[in-house]
């Protein structure tokens, strides 16, 4: 099949210069207890999750990644504490430093800021409608304030009240958050207070009560879960971009900081299943999430979760999915360091004029199985072939893409690029890219050739 088209989009230098700089991830949750199979890689059973030396090393590695904020998901589980509690028994050997103390100490050494959790009173299913659970969380807060309120790394409180914001936050959720907040302000007046709710995918932004309920909250920061890892919709990223902007408009009126909690994980088996392990998402998906949060007006980006999804190669304490957690680390650090490939991908995700992660976007050009070539408008700088990767629908990028140029009557191969291959693609839709740089000047014609194995969606950009 032969298809001849002109370039869909030419990005000029001025257009590229106007693109925002994507916010990096500057905070992450710390996950201490092994609760279920979801934590297979974030807190492996084969590693002592209470080892203070291990946590000191991991905090140092996270600092190298640019983390400024550490958020304890919980500091107790099943009525055992990960800190020297007098309220409950300890979840670590009594003859050594607690994991909470080790993390706080290393965080202080690196100038990092820690949000202390008030959970769990019992376990990950704490129900604040139960007076005993609510009372124990307040008792824990009081004890933790006495132990760490003056610690140089203590920055504030994370309230593990992950109520659903959609379609509208309930009165009970508002009251539960505000009750904990009131006690936190009495104990630690200068501490920042943060929640990280879910449910923006089905939030009713048109209901005036939605904004009113947010305005009633007395917290300092709402770090919304972007729910891309949880895959609450078939194609969640395009609508997320609009929802961030709607939330930004609300937060401009409330004075509450709007942070993004960009989920870095995919699922080894089924989604949202406690018997399915969290695994690293392909980096193009995660980069698109960061770009969406930036463009939508988030003030900071944190992530559930860095430790276990990203792992430094050669770490003294290896953690995460073999190979893929190290690759996630290398890809993120390459982007952070200004790698040309990932910066080009970032430009794509920040552009409003290109197709995104949805098969129904009319800008995609669909190709069936077979060999294809398309003639494109010549350009002297960079040519990007964007490709939708939606394995769950049988839509995958070509195995390789070749660029040919014609200057003096003959087609000459310029370069062949093999798109990166990803393993953890069972549930997501994201955009991959093949990027050609150093295109020879003076080409009269250019064409791209590729072979499609199943079905491919392609879009071409030049600059």
Segments from the language model and where they lie:
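Aromatic-lined substrate-binding rim segments of carbohydrate-active enzymes
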Residues: 52-121, 172-193, 237-242, 246
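Boundary/entry segment of secreted carbohydrate-active catalytic domains
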Residues: 21-68, 73-76, 199
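An active-site-proximal structural segment forming one wall of the substrate-binding cleft
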Residues: 94-110, 128-156, 213, 293
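Substrate-binding cleft of secreted/luminal carbohydrate-active enzymes
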Residues: 226-233, 256-342
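Aromatic, loop-rich ligand-recognition surfaces of beta-strand-rich domains
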Residues: 360-415, 430-463
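Aromatic-lined carbohydrate-recognition surfaces of secreted/lumenal glycan-active proteins
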Residues: 115-127, 131, 158-162, 178-207, ...
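Aromatic- and acid-rich polysaccharide-binding/catalytic face
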Residues: 152-165, 198, 207-238
